[in-house]
Amino acid sequence: MVAKLRQSIRGASNPWGAVKDTLANLVEVVNAATGSTLSLSKADTQAGATGASAGTLLTKGAGVSAAESYAVGFVRNGTLVTTRIVVDLTGLVGSGTDVDIIGNTGGATSAHWGQVTTAKCGALIGGRVTCLEVPAGGTNDIDFYSAVESTGAQDGLVTSLTETALVTSGGAWTSGAAKGMTALPAANDYLYITNGAASGGTFTAGKFLIELFGYAA
């Protein structure tokens, strides 16, 4: 068995193939010594509930294209599907009206952060928002909503849409603060970020992590 192991390491031209062969041989050694029937299998997949690939991740609307950054990832572990969205508000504009949608200046439409679907995110059972960087330039009291419509516009009231309040901060965010969602986006809803206070401006900072937890339906 040791000879077979060494041969596998020496003979594999692909280093990843060598690692796989080595692990397979180690499994054989353990099984022979213990009478077990261990096997190699993939525990996690970087995918959505139905094996979504990088080409089918959430896509932000044109109305927030000026945002400094936007990143989305899915992880499936067993039947648990976790969706993570990191947004940077830098470059976007908040009006001077409470619960107005934040987005590109000039009332840009489709100021959403992606559509939540069961196929990608699973059937939702929970969610939370974490402040990674305290907003500056605009209000630091930021709220999170979802809505049926994708057409919500910067400087427009999110309450003019068919909306659901996910997280209302009730005051200024602090770095590292996490708030659980008091309600969840309905399937096929779009995500929006809004002013939580009547204070406007162009954001020069403000990063948030939005997490959604679901199960493979």
Question: Each predicted region: which residue ranges?
Answer:
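Surface-exposed, low-hydrophobicity beta-strand/loop segments enriched in small/polar/acidic residues
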Residues: 2-217
